[in-house]
Amino acid sequence: LFRSARGVSWLAAMQLVAPAYEEATGVHIRLQEAPSMGRSPEAIPNRLARRESVDIVLMEDAALSRLINQSEVQKHSRVELGKSFIAMAVRQGAVKPDIGTMKAFRSTLLDAQSLAYSDSSSGLYLAHLLFPRMKLAVQLKAKSKTVTGESVGAVVARGEAQLGFQQLSELMRVPGIVIVGLIPDSVQKMTLYSAGIISHSAHPSESAALVKYLASPHAHDAIERSGLIPVH
């Protein structure tokens, strides 16, 4: 089983789900983490292009759609699982800036010495849509860092960025950081996460059963504890 989000989002949920599921079914789940997009060798599209052994992907729905269009994922296997939202974090021990209003959020961005965001959908949204819409693209570009191949939280924890932006589900279990909160509702972007079965899966029936389980109420608690909102 592949999971898409770097860091901890679906890995955390699956680590909660896997033991009971394995005991009940006798099916062993092997978890691997990988970015859902990007140029790194670890990114799911690049791993699938190398025909690595994969049965299921759990990833951003938009990225899953591309894999379906490329015939890498079975079209009718796609199931929506959880919603995620963008949060901001600072290094543990640092002052928590105010982002409760758009005015405060804007001031925090301008006052920050540095900020980091991922090279996945949340980071692309911030860099190419939100910051230009706020007329801050020029001011923020010089002090922004795009993170590839690891959690934005890890970069913040090392002190390499003052502010870090990523999905709440990706940030909430990273050590050494404190989550300030979600960015304001008026500029928030929901990311939908879905599951799909790989076209060359060696275990299609077992994969279908697991995807069905993840979309059932049995998995709701694990999904919520991972910072996601269940769809079903």
Q: Predicted segment positions?
A:
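Phosphate-/polyanion-interacting regions in eukaryotic proteins
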Residues: 58
